[in-house]
Regions:
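Surface-exposed amphipathic alpha-helical tracts and adjacent flexible/coil segments at the periphery
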Residues: 1-21, 25-35, 48-85, 94, ...
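Conserved nucleotide-cofactor-binding alpha/beta core module
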Residues: 123-124
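Short glycine-enriched, charge-decorated loop/helix-capping segments at active-site entrances
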Residues: 35-41
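Glycine-rich, highly charged phosphate/nucleotide-binding loops
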Residues: 42-47
Length: 706
C-alpha cells in the first residue's frame, strides 16, 4: 500500500505550493461550511479550476465540509456539495451527522471521510464509521503509535492521521471554549484560539498551560508507513504558502525514500514554524509539561528562505506528468502520435499525410526534438519513440500541431469529471413540537450529589457517569426516577471491556438507560435491554442529525448547547429532545491532566490510563485567565481533564422561554455543586424558590454561536 501525503490548501497560492512540492492530495474549503472559515478558501469558479489543476497533475482533492450546520444552512451546504461533485472532487470530509446523512442521499457516489471533528479515537468508532458508509476516518491526534497500529490492522476502511502541525489542547470536535466565551464556535470553523492565551493556577495567569507545541512526526514516517496508515496529513490551512511548500517537500521526500529526516531537514521544519520546538508526545504515548510551548510575539518568518521557496513553486514546473510518446510517420499514411501516462490514460491523434521530400528529408532526431517541446504545459516527454520512413518531408508546424493536440486530449482525459448521480435536497420531515412543559432531568458528577432530598423532588431522569455507579446504592431510589449510565466521551479501545462490564453491572442495579456521546459507544450498548440517549457530546445541531440518530436506535437526545432558543424551537424533533438549561458548560476535554502538569502526580505516569487515580487532584486549584475568571478543572476518565466554564448557565427565571421550545426534557448539569446546592437548584427550576447562584450567564441561549 502506498501512503498518501495530504497537504493543506488555504488558498490558490498554497494549493500551487502544495502540488508543486509533492503532495499526493490536498484538502481545501470553499463557501462558508468548513473548519477554517478564516482561511482564504475558494470561490465556486476557483474551486472548479483548482480541481482541474490538481487532477491534471495526479493530485486528489478533498473538500472540507466538516462543520456543524443549522437547519437553515443545510440547503446551502447541500448546494455546495452538489457543486463539488460536479467539479469532480475526490472526497468530502464531514463532521455533522445531518450532513453525513444528507450527502449520502444527494451525492451517493462521492466518498465521504470522517473528519477528526467526529472525535473518532477507538477501533469501534472507526468500524461504525465504516458501517455507515464512510471510506476513511481521520483519527484523533491524541492516539499513540500502538493505538494507531491496532486500528490500522483491524479497520475495514482507510486511516488518516496528522503528522505535522498545530495541536489543539482539546479533542477535536469537543472544544466549546471559543464558542462559550466569545461566541466563535470551533465546531463551526470560527475558533478564536483562546487556548493560546495566558492562564495559570492559584489566581495567576502567568503561563500557557493550554498551548501545545506543534507536532512533528517526521522521524516516524517509515514506521507509520509500515503500520498501514493510508494517509499522513499536514495541518496548516491558516499558514503561509511558503510554509506549506517547505513542510510538504520534506515529507514527500521522506515518504518517497522511506527514511527518517536528516538534521538539516529537521532544522528546516523548525525554521518554517514552531512553538519553542516540536512535540512527539501523543504518538510516543507520553503526556506532560514538555509538550507545551508558545511562539514569541516578536518571532519572524524566515523571509529570505521563503523567497527562495516561493520562486521555486511559482515556476510550476516541479510537478510534471511524464508521458511516453510514440510517433509513427509512414509514406502514404496520416501521421500518428500516441501519448500514454503512468495512470493508464492513452490518446492517439493523427495529422496530415507526409509528402515526399523535395530536398532534405526530415530525420527522426528532428521529429523527437519537436515532440519533446512540452514547455508551458504540465507534461514532460519521459520517453519518445519515432518510427519514420525515409525520404519524407514534415513541417515543424505540423509536428507542433500534432503534439499540442495529443497533450490537449491527454489533459482532457486526466481532468475529466466522473459521471455521478446527483439528487435534489429534501428537507427533513416536519414534526410538530411537543406542547407540554419539559420534564426536569439532572446530571451528576460526584457520588455525594445523589441524595434522598434530590430524588424526593422527582427528577424525570438522573444521569450518572458509568464509573460512579459502582459506588452508589440505587435501590432506595428505584421506581421514583430513571437512572442513565453516562459513558465517558473519551476513552480507549482497551477500555471497552471494562466499560461493557460496568454497563452490565449498572443494568443489574436497575439502570434503565445509557447516554452515549461518541459513535464508538454504539457497540458498547448493543444487546443491553436499555434505552439509548444521545448526550450533548454528539453535537446535535439540526433536524437531519436527530433523524440520523433516531435511525441508530436513540430514544431521546440532547441538542447542542450552542443553539439559541429559536434554533431549538425550529428543530423538527423526530424523537424526544433535551436541552441543558442549568450548569457550568463544558469547555474542553484534554488528554493532558492539567493538575498533574501543574503540581505533579505519580498516578499520571505510573498507572494504566483506564484506572482512575485516588482523586487527589479533585481539590486542585482552578484555572485562571487574564481577566481573573476561574475555570474548574474536573477529573475525567483515564486521568484526562475537563475544563468547565467559570460562569454558571442559569435560566430558572426564564422558564417561559425554554418551556415553550417543544422540548421533552430540560437538563440541570451539576458539576462542582454540593448535594445541598443540587437540591436548591432543582427546587428553583421547579418554581419553589427564586434563589440564584452568583456569577451566572445566559450562555448561548439567546445569542447562539457564530
Amino acid at each position: 500500500m502506498t501512503t498518501e501525503l495530504l497537504a493543506p490548501a488555504g488558498g490558490q497560492e498554497a494549493l500551487v505550493a502544495a502540488v508543486q512540492s509533492g503532495a499526493d492530495a490536498v484538502y481545501m474549503g470553499f463557501g462558508a461550511f468548513n473548519a477554517r472559515r478564516s482561511a482564504r478558501n475558494f470561490s465556486d469558479e476557483e474551486f472548479r479550476a483548482a480541481v482541474s489543476y490538481c487532477h491534471l497533475r495526479g493530485v486528489k482533492v478533498y473538500l472540507t465540509l466538516n462543520t456543524l450546520v443549522t437547519d437553515r444552512e443545510l440547503p446551502a451546504l447541500a448546494a455546495e456539495a452538489r457543486t463539488a461533485s460536479e467539479c469532480g472532487v475526490d472526497a468530502i470530509l464531514v463532521q455533522d451527522w445531518g450532513v453525513l446523512a444528507t450527502l449520502q442521499k444527494i451525492i451517493p457516489d462521492v466518498p465521504l471521510h470522517a473528519s477528526t471533528q467526529m472525535s473518532l479515537h477507538t477501533l469501534s468508532g472507526v468500524q461504525e464509521a465504516a458501517r455507515l458508509g464512510m471510506t476513511r476516518a481521520v483519527l484523533a491526534r491524541e492516539l499513540s503509535r500502538g493505538e494507531i497500529a491496532e486500528i490500522c490492522q483491524k479497520s475495514p476502511i482507510e486511516i488518516e492521521t496528522f503528522v505535522h502541525g498545530a495541536l489543539c489542547m482539546c479533542y477535536s470536535g469537543q472544544c466549546e471554549m471559543s464558542a462559550v466565551i466569545g461566541r466563535r464556535s470551533g465546531t463551526r470553523g470560527a475558533c478564536a484560539q483562546p487556548c493560546r492565551l495566558p492562564y495559570g493556577f492559584s489566581g495567576r495567569a502567568d503561563g500557557h498551560p493550554l498551548s501545545l507545541k506543534d507536532a512533528n512526526l517526521a522521524p516516524f514516517v517509515p514506521e507509520m508507513m509500515d503500520l498501514g496508515v493510508a494517509c499522513l496529513k499536514i495541518e496548516g490551512r491558516m499558514k503561509r504558502p511558503e510554509y506549506v511548500a517547505a513542510v510538504t517537500e520534506i515529507y514527500a521526500r521522506l515518504l518517497r525514500e522511506h527514511r527518517t529526516p536528516t538534521k538539516d531537514e529537521q532544522k528546516k521544519l523548525a525554521l518554517a514554524f514552531s512553538r519553542d520546538g516540536f512535540t512527539e508526545g501523543y504518538y510516543r504515548g507520553v503526556r506532560g509539561r514538555e509538550m507545551f510551548g508558545t511562539r514569541p510575539e516578536n518571532a519572524r518568518w524566515p523571509e529570505d528562505w521563503f523567497s527562495e521557496i516561493r520562486a521555486r513553486y511559482e515556476k510550476e514546473n516541479l510537478r510534471l506528468v511524464p508521458l511516453a510518446l510514440n510517433c509513427t510517420i509512414r509514406a502514404g499514411q496520416p501521421m500518428a502520435l500516441t501519448a500514454e501516462d503512468l495512470d493508464g490514460h492513452t490518446v492517439t491523434v493523427t495529422g496530415a499525410v507526409p509528402e515526399a521530400a523535395r530536398s532534405r528529408a526530415v530525420t527522426a532526431e528532428e521529429v523527437e526534438t519537436r515532440l519533446r517541446k512540452t514547455g508551458g504545459t504540465a507534461f514532460s516527454a519521459a520517453q519518445c519513440a519515432v518510427a519514420l520512413d525515409g525520404g519524407l518531408a514534415v513541417s515543424a508546424g505540423a509536428l507542433n500541431a500534432l503534439r499540442r493536440e495529443a497533450l490537449a486530449q491527454m489533459e482532457a482525459q486526466r481532468t475529466a469529471v466522473p459521471k455521478r448521480r446527483v439528487f435534489d435536497f429534501v428537507p427533513p420531515t416536519i414534526v410538530k413540537n411537543d406542547a407540554g412543559k419539559p420534564l426536569l432531568t439532572v446530571s451528576l458528577h460526584r457520588a455525594e450529589q445523589l441524595s434522598e432530598e434530590l430524588i424526593a423532588l422527582a427528577p424525570a431522569r438522573v444521569y450518572v457517569p458509568v464509573e460512579l455507579l459502582a459506588q452508589l446504592d440505587l435501590s432506595p431510589h428505584l421506581g421514583r426516577t430513571e437512572f442513565f449510565a453516562v459513558l465517558p466521551r473519551i476513552y480507549r479501545t482497551q477500555d471497552e471491556p471494562i466499560l461493557r462490564a460496568l454497563l452490565e453491572d449498572a443494568a443489574k442495579k436497575g439502570v434503565t438507560g445509557v447516554s452515549i456521546g461518541n459513535l464508538g459507544h454504539l457497540p458498547l450498548a448493543r444487546g443491553l435491554d436499555c434505552k439509548l440517549h444521545g448526550g450533548w457530546p454528539l453535537n446535535l445541531y439540526n433536524s437531519a442529525a436527530l433523524a440520523f440518530w433516531k435511525e441508530q436506535g436513540l430514544s431521546s437526545a440532547c441538542v447542542s448547547f450552542e443553539l439559541r432558543d429559536a434554533q431549538i424551537r425550529d428543530l423538527s424533533k423526530c424523537l424526544p429532545c433535551e436541552a441543558i438549561v442549568y450548569g457550568r458548560l463544558p469547555l474542553m476535554v484534554t488528554e493532558n491532566c492539567l493538575n498533574a502538569n501543574e503540581s505533579g502526580c505519580r498516578y499520571f505516569t505510573e498507572r494504566p490510563a483506564s484506572v482512575l487515580c485516588d482523586g487527589a487532584c479533585a481539590s486542585a486549584p482552578e484555572l485562571t485567565d487574564r481577566r481573573g475568571e476561574h475555570f474548574p478543572v474536573l477529573r475525567a476518565w483515564g486521568c484526562r481533564s475537563e475544563i468547565e466554564n467559570g460562569k454558571i448557565l442559569y435560566l430558572a427565571d426564564k422558564s417561559k422561554d425554554w418551556q415553550t421550545l417543544g422540548l421533552r426534557f430540560a437538563q440541570l448539569r451539576f458539576t462542582t455543586e454540593s448535594a445541598s446546592e443540587c437540591v436548591r437548584v432543582l427546587r428553583a427550576y421547579q418554581g419553589k424558590t427564586v434563589e440564584a447562584p452568583e456569577n451566572i450567564t445566559r450562555g448561548l441561549f439567546y445569542r447562539g454561536a457564530e
